[in-house]
């Protein structure tokens, strides 16, 4: 089904002749904003219903328009609307198809409305829905990490700084770090949603309208919290779009971090984890390969998310009030960013929840004892030694261990005593990783009780979210 494109576009009513084909080719946006058809139709239905309630259009005409727009929405969803470049954008496609269905009554629809406040509303409705979709995907991701964390409360491994073994932590504590990250991401999406959920309709092109619109009624019909307060700002404001893409970009950066760890941990060199075959790929040449593409794609998608954000900010930079056609270019990053995040989050969630973590290999990586050097320093601090002095003494022990080719855990009590007079026989207890964790029970620390408390807190939080 194709809307009639022979009629002169409404935006050229005061212009002579037809637009140059080169301008038309440059101006076409339907390939991008066509994805906004549902939001555009929803806004139009709320607008025309308000016009009827205000006595601006006949109620019977408004009812016909609302019913016909339901049909147009169904045709878009079924792929029956063929995009016509001559009609430029989604708004014109909807309006032309509406005209075919209800005739001249379609002309009532645009009373008191401009493309400028119309598209601003469409984007806000999209952003609200996108925030909900991203939040749901990140919640699924949190649940995947939480399930593995619960299964690995007693699994210990080296924690890393600078990708060097640093101190022992539990795998549960490590996985809960990602639950925290994605929790902050969800908070950001909630904040973006709250700021986006207001209606700009009634702002017109830039200066409102003389018609007696009920802006609050439209907002209420759309489930929005209120209306904008400055018409110039309302038609040119894309802050919520930028905030959405920032939230997507930061969540994608967090996904890239677990992506990198999946890549590292599944190497033979680390051997900490094995991906399910369902979340790995092979090689077209090397038959033995099992590649962690899910992690690599998560890393790569972060670059795309960052690019979307920078692209939008560059479009917005330096625009004078109010609306400028530059804003047409916001659709591609805005519409693609949230979808990419949801796809990536769901794939990573599947990879994490089906991965096998190798506890014995992780604990083996702690065997040499250097990850417990800080415990030896704090042993001295517990005995009244200033930390810097203790740090220096253990540093000398570490250097001696390296020269001798013996792990720190294998040094004798007598050897430890040569590095500081306060070292006694029980210093060797410092090199028990599980004992070390049991001594780290501050809130947020990796001690078993602290980790169990965090598991319970997140299980309660996500349980409430599910209800």
Swiss-Prot record:
Q: Does the keyword S-adenosyl-L-methionine apply?
A: no
InterPro entries hit by this protein: Arg_succ_lyase_C, Argininosuccinate_lyase, Fumarase/histidase_N, Fumarate_lyase_CS, Fumarate_lyase_fam, Fumarate_lyase_N, L-Aspartase-like
Q: Which reaction does it catalyse?
A: 2-(N(omega)-L-arginino)succinate = fumarate + L-arginine
Enzyme Commission identifier(s): 4.3.2.1
Task: Name the enzyme's class.
Answer: lyase
Q: List the disulfide bonds.
A: none
The listed locations are: Cytoplasm
GO MF term set:
argininosuccinate lyase activity
Name the CDD domains for this protein: Argininosuccinate_lyase
Q: In which pathway does it act?
A: Amino-acid biosynthesis; L-arginine biosynthesis; L-arginine from L-ornithine and carbamoyl phosphate: step 3/3
Biological processes annotated in GO: arginine biosynthetic process via ornithine; L-arginine biosynthetic process
Q: Name one GO cellular component term.
A: cytosol
SUPFAM superfamilies per record: L-aspartase-like
Does Secreted count among this protein's keywords? no
What keywords are annotated for this sequence in UniProt?
Answer: Amino-acid biosynthesis, Arginine biosynthesis, Cytoplasm, Lyase
Q: Which family does it belong to?
A: Belongs to the lyase 1 family. Argininosuccinate lyase subfamily.
Q: Which PANTHER family match?
A: ARGININOSUCCINATE LYASE (PTHR43814:SF1)
Q: What is this protein called?
A: Argininosuccinate lyase
UniProt organism field: Anaeromyxobacter dehalogenans (strain 2CP-1 / ATCC BAA-258)
């Amino acid at each position: 089904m194709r809307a009639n494109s022979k009629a002169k576009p409404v935006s050229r009513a005061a212009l002579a002749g037809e637009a140059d084909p080169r301008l038309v080719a440059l101006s076409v946006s339907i390939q991008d904003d066509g994805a906004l058809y549902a939001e555009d139709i929803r806004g139009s239905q709320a607008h025309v219903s308000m016009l009827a309630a205000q006595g601006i259009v006949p109620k019977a005409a408004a009812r016909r328009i609302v019913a016909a727009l339901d049909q147009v929405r169904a045709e878009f969803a079924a792929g029956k609307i063929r995009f016509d470049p001559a009609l430029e954008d989604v708004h014109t496609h909807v309006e032309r198809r509406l005209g075919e269905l209800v005739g001249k009554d379609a002309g009532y629809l645009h009373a008191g409305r401009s493309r400028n406040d119309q598209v601003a509303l469409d984007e806000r409705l999209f952003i609200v829905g996108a925030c909900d979709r991203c939040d749901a995907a990140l919640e699924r991701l949190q649940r995947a990490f939480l399930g593995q964390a619960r299964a690995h409360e007693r699994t210990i491994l080296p924690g890393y700084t600078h990708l060097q073994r640093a101190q022992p932590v539990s795998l549960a504590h490590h996985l809960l770090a990602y639950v925290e990250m994605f929790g902050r991401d969800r908070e950001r999406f909630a904040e973006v949603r709250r700021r986006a959920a207001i209606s700009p309709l009634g702002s017109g092109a830039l200066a409102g309208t003389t018609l007696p619109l009920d802006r609050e009624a439209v907002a209420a019909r759309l489930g929005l919290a209120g209306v904008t307060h400055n018409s110039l700002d309302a038609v040119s404001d894309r802050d919520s779009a930028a905030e959405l893409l920032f939230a997507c970009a930061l969540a994608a950066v967090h996904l890239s971090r677990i992506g990198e760890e999946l890549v590292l941990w599944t190497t033979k060199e680390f051997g900490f984890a094995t991906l399910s075959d369902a979340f790995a790929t092979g090689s077209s040449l090397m038959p033995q390969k099992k590649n962690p593409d899910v992690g690599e794609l998560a890393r790569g998608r972060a670059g795309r998310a960052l690019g979307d954000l920078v692209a939008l900010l560059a479009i917005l930079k330096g625009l004078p009030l109010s609306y400028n056609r530059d804003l047409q270019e916001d659709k591609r990053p805005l519409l693609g960013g949230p979808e990419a995040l949801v796809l990536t989050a769901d794939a990573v969630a599947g990879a994490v929840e089906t991965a096998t973590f190798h506890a014995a290999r992780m604990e083996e990586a702690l065997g040499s004892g250097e990850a417990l050097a800080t415990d030896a320093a704090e042993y001295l601090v517990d005995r009244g030694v200033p930390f810097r002095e203790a740090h220096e003494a253990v540093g000398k022990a570490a250097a001696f261990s390296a020269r001798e080719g013996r792990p720190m855990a294998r040094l004798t009590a007598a050897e430890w005593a040569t590095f500081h007079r306060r070292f006694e026989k029980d210093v060797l207890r410092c090199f028990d990783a599980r004992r070390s964790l049991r001594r780290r029970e501050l809130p947020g620390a990796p001690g078993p009780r602290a980790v169990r408390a965090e598991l319970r807190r997140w299980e309660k939080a996500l349980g409430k979210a599910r209800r």
